[in-house]
């Protein structure tokens, strides 16, 4: 069944009416979905979408004028000069038209308000672009100069939204297969102002299943043996979750189902061609899948390339004329499209954009809606929305069914795949995604593609130009090209009053907030680029003529920036572009919110079974989508005004808005203080205020004269909240009147939403309390929390639970007569319970998430991924079939892990040798569960919990810094955390044991080290005695070497080569020509040094007399030390042996190093005179003094 048959079956009445309209060439309603331009030759714009009954339609718009504007001087000679410039560059144009417009930058008085422009018309976009580039390089100001997407300019100029109903008039009509083709001119298109009929555009949701013979790996399209073996597709009306038709295309036999049509293909090539064929039969307007832009589309395209059928597949799916392969890959296969998820995060998408169908990845949409979501799987998003889950079918079972070709089991795979596709549409409808994006497109004159794949800034910019170019907004000429030097720096910071930290249990605190501060400032002070005055002389001249100006000044990059904005004084004609647009958006949103409230009240009165409920629900969703779109634009407005890459950017305006915000918050602050109110905290657009004590005198006295029971105290708190609400309502009205008198408008207003009591401020933008909105409510389970990191992305349940316990305990109402534990006591009590009673925690309490970003220097994640890579390689080397449990996530994808405990190890000096790096302790959740690995609870406490707990107590006097510390909050936080670390160490039994063990290691090593130094001194004195005989230094060297060998190996010679070398030394002692041979011997000594050391080290047990004495002495010292201290930890025999070997080895190395140094001296002499005694003694002392025994360096 194709699209036309489905439409006729589902909408017979509307289809008959549309057929009649087509027969008589009467006006038709058309809903555009996808936009394509013909940019070569004569410009044409193709819009694809549906007629009101659901027929697929293509609207070709011809005879669209191609032009841009350039500002010139007033006399005609400049026009002639412009013509000559274009002719000199061989730029062909059709004609020139003169018009007047208002430049967007800089204030112009009424008589000079408009400037002359020339509109240059072209036959093609190529010549237009060439002219824009040339004239911009020549220094001319241009307008209407879009160079990337000309259709946006067409939409603005015609006031023709690209995402709402359009009426087609005077069209040429040609039916061709499933597509109804229309040809029109711009004059034949009329924007339909009413809401229009129900949209019957078609969405195709699909999913693919892939297979790899290498078990445990993710199928890779670049691997020849990895295949796509199933594609399931389901189509819907755009607003519905009821399927219109379903198809399953498979390479394995599959039992037929009444729920879908089954197509069995003999090969992957045929499967892909069948997919394209079915796609063309349904001709969907939107194609959607879950994560399909990162997996499904790349897989389909790559496999089509391998089978050499991509051109055929594309041309079957496309409604455009046939394209060659190179054109498809260049123009229609979007390989890397960066989609913005949040301010900090973007994601790369890849998809095949066939003309007539808009691709949309549901996962990207959901991530934009939930930018802080811990999990981004289909199952997780369905759970968040309360929707039915997907089918549970593990991949290894699916692959087994495919391998066995069991038709019954393959039907289960098909059902799994079909339901995945169904859930994509469920999510789109639940979140009203497409209507929301459409409303954004209507406001900004952009396409649905723009609304999905571009950030908000360019849409705000496009909307501003659409407002500006029309007469009612002043006919302002706007460029889309950013000009001038783009400086980077910080604008004036917000006005901040440091919080009075700590727990407030006696007086309610109320937040007073500016409503939409930055948009309100723009409206109040007429901040707009065409109202800006740059020079003081011009400002003085305007003020002399009676104009009212708002002065702004601030420091930016070490210089003073100043300017003036001509104020509107509530006269509509004097309002700038920015205020006019914001006021229009505000008025529209206010009206929609009122309508939404009425619709909501109606919904509550009508049961779901009522015939009109669905229509009411649809209307409610549409109105809500419109008001949300308006809110988005109002909130994004200042962001674009302050964006230095925007063509509208003006530094004095961007900084002027923030500095005016500072001024007004200070103004309100002083007003409130003078009224006798207290300030607990203030920041950017809000103040947290306490009422005067006198307000509560009467109710407090009543309590003091009562029996002071807990019920009486609760009544007191209840009355305090009510009194605060009443007082703040009065104060708010007084503040707004004061602001109106100051700025002369009513746009800048403050409001209060809740009273907080009790409340606790822990830092800037960090506080919590019990919120009382309309009536008092002392429920500690519903806390008002701002900035406290218990809900931070990646945070564990452990941290959230401990933080919540502390806050809930601190919010309990306690009478002044009772013991009110300070916050530090509450924190320690909760911490002690968390550390001592470990059994209360489950495995899930420790699960964390992080994002894998290969290009980001997140050391812990980088170390962990490096370990997982090494583990996978090791498994492959040993022939393991499955390594997927250690697979690397996709870049940007979040993964779950836990921190596991590693065995505590020390070196002989008492330094811990086990790793403390987070990356070495991380393990995937599945691996930790499978192997029952112990969780390192202390790591979580120290690294995640204590920082949060320190935030609660850092206001204590003992943590406060001295007066000369600049960042006092950071200092206090660090001290508080250190205090809590010591507290945890004192109550954690394992931590105390580890510390004790380390102390024993360190102190034992200290004793041995001292003994070694003594014996080295004795041994060095022996060498000094031998070297004192300076009459024959070579003979002294030989004697000292022979002594060393004799002393350490009386029974056996060290080795033959060393014996031979010593004999050669003795034979050549009196030969003045022996230097050359001595150099050879020295070289041999370097080669043999390791052998000598190793031989002596291996014979350590046979060293007698002096070394025996040393060994016995050290053993005695260690034993005495341990007995004295009576420590529970015992030094193992292995440690003692290492200590003793360390002692032996260093005695040997001293001798060798001294010998080497003196050979250097002897070889460096130019004659046979021996070195002086002083020089030799100094050298020995230096050599012995530089030796620092290190067990780790030697043993490793």
Swiss-Prot record:
EC main group: transferase
Annotated PROSITE patterns: DNA_POLYMERASE_B (PS00116)
Highest taxon of source: Viruses
Catalytic reaction annotation: DNA(n) + a 2'-deoxyribonucleoside 5'-triphosphate = DNA(n+1) + diphosphate
Entry keywords, A to Z: DNA replication, DNA-binding, DNA-directed DNA polymerase, Nucleotidyltransferase, Transferase, Viral DNA replication
InterPro entries hit by this protein: DNA-dir_DNA_pol_B, DNA-dir_DNA_pol_B_CS, DNA-dir_DNA_pol_B_exonuc, DNA-dir_DNA_pol_B_multi_dom, DNA/RNA_pol_sf, DNA_pol_B_thumb, DNA_pol_palm_dom_sf, DNA_pol_type-B
E.C. no: 2.7.7.7
GO BP terms, alphabetized: DNA-templated DNA replication; viral DNA genome replication
Family in the record: Belongs to the DNA polymerase type-B family.
PANTHER family: DNA POLYMERASE CATALYTIC SUBUNIT, DNA POLYMERASE DELTA CATALYTIC SUBUNIT
Other remarks in the entry: Consistent with its intracellular location, ASFV encodes its own replicative DNA polymerase and three base excision repair enzymes: a class II AP endonuclease, the repair polymerase Pol X, and an ATP-dependent DNA ligase.
Protein's recorded name: DNA polymerase beta
Species the sequence originates in: African swine fever virus (isolate Pig/Kenya/KEN-50/1950)
